[in-house]
């Protein structure tokens, strides 16, 4: 007897009156006066449940089946038929029901009722994927992940695994998690009283990466088109709906390319991925239309069909000043755009995805290429409504003398970056790249305001229980 998924059935891959085997968890159950038990079975393959009709004549009906409650797992052998009910298209007439996992105290099951607040579900991330909401998030996340890989593969990019542990801070800033095996109760010290990291595992300070960009550039300077896709870590104690301490980043590096190239490429990539979601995830997107954002289909179709707006940083500042929404006394060329500034621009002024380019070099990292004015860098950020920045990118500084000057200006030791400088010594090339915050993109697509609700096990300050 063939084991099938509920999704296979709704894709019409299974013929009616076929003998099948289906497995999953009880989502709901109800008895009839005719000696029948109706079980709504859920297996995670899609949003739908499958109604299983069980007669009380089965040998284990009284001893096991009648005691089933929400969350119990079962294995059903039966016949697939058209349902005579109006709430479902199919049902299974059960011939055998094997109880796999019972819940002895149904009242203790944390997600037994039909509705729970997000606050409650954030406290049970190990179980919340069993709800419709988080099941749908997980399926869309999977399709989005694969769509991005697919787009890059079709465009000739090679996936390169970037290291999780590093001795450098790619952004030239702090907020990094340290990696150490030193005994916290007996930390070795130097004569000057500082920690002796030579006694540590790597013989020097080591951190969890905040970006794989620098190492990825080494392969861009040989394979031309490369990307990495994996977790990165930031020890920012930012308790906001937009920040996580561990999140996934897609980083793309392209040889012989400029800022215009990566702006166009990143926009095409986003549109391709969202097109896949609209094509492959209709059932789940419709769930979010009914429960989160009623305009989700229109919003995503507009995103896929219309060109992004594009302005320079200085124009963004002028728009903010003229809006009279912000204090003129603290608005000036060279200031950093806050999340409120970004949201005004993308949600109220342009009301559509926006690319901002040519930021002051004082606001950006050492590796971004300095423009001819020596005041700005050839950089870009992509902002989307409801989320803010989802992509940051730039041309990379390929001129060794300019790169060394940036190290000096930012008080960075260029010797720490000796291998990065080698790329400029030996056959340097113009190249560009960008990083995409995966969870932020998923938040935008689904219209979910809190980034913790699109991540299976969100890591934030004081939250690492699982």
From Swiss-Prot:
EC number: 6.1.1.22
UniProt keyword annotation of ATP-binding present: yes
The keyword Protein biosynthesis is assigned to this record: yes
Stretch forming the signal peptide: none
Reactions catalysed, as given in the entry: tRNA(Asn) + L-asparagine + ATP = L-asparaginyl-tRNA(Asn) + AMP + diphosphate + H(+)
PROSITE patterns assigned: AA_TRNA_LIGASE_II
Main location (coarse class): cytoplasm
UniProt family annotation: Belongs to the class-II aminoacyl-tRNA synthetase family.
Subunit structure: Homodimer.
The protein, known as: Asparagine--tRNA ligase
């Amino acid at each position: 007897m063939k084991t099938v998924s509920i999704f296979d059935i709704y894709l019409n891959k299974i013929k009616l009156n076929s003998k099948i085997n289906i497995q999953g968890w009880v989502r709901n159950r109800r008895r009839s006066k005719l000696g029948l038990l109706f079980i709504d079975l859920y297996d995670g393959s899609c949003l739908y449940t499958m109604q299983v009709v069980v007669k009380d004549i089965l040998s284990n009906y009284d001893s096991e089946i009648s005691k089933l409650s929400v969350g119990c797992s079962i294995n059903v052998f039966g016949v697939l038929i058209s349902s005579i009910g109006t709430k479902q298209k199919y049902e299974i007439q059960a011939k055998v029901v094997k109880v796999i996992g019972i819940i002895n105290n149904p009242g203790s099951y944390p997600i037994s009722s039909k509705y729970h607040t997000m606050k409650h579900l954030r406290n049970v991330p190990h179980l919340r994927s069993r709800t419709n909401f988080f099941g749908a998030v997980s399926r869309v996340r999977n399709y989005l992940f694969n769509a991005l890989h697919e787009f890059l593969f079709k465009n000739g990019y090679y996936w390169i695994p970037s290291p999780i542990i590093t001795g450098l801070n790619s952004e030239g800033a702090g907020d990094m998690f340290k990696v150490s095996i030193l005994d916290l109760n007996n930390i070795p010290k130097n004569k000057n009283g500082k920690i002796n990291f030579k006694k540590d595992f790597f013989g020097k300070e080591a951190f969890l990466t905040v970006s794989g960009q620098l190492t990825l550039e080494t392969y861009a300077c040989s394979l031309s088109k490369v990307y990495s896709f994996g977790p990165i870590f930031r020890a920012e104690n930012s308790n906001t709906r937009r920040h996580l301490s561990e999140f996934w980043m897609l980083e793309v590096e392209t040889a012989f390319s400029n800022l215009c190239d990566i702006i166009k490429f990143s926009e095409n990539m986003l549109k391709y991925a969202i097109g896949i979601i609209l094509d492959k995830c209709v059932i789940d997107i419709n769930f979010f239309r009914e429960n989160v954002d009623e305009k989700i289909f229109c919003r995503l179709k507009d995103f896929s069909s219309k060109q992004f707006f594009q302005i320079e940083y200085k124009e963004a500042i002028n728009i903010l000043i003229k809006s009279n929404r912000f204090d003129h006394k603290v608005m000036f060329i060279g200031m950093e755009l806050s999340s409120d500034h970004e949201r005004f621009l993308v949600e109220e002024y342009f009301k559509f995805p926006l690319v901002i380019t040519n930021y002051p070099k004082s606001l950006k990292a050492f590796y971004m290429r300095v423009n001819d004015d020596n005041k700005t860098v050839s950089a870009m950020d992509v902002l989307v409504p409801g989320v803010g920045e989802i992509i940051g990118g730039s041309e990379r500084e390929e001129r060794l003398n300019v790169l060394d000057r940036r190290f000096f200006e930012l008080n960075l030791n260029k010797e720490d970056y000796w291998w990065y400088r080698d790329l400029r010594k030996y056959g340097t090339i113009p190249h560009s790249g960008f990083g995409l915050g995966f969870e932020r993109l998923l938040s935008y697509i689904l219209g979910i305001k809190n980034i913790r609700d699109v991540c299976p096990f969100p890591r934030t300050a004081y939250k690492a229980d699982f």
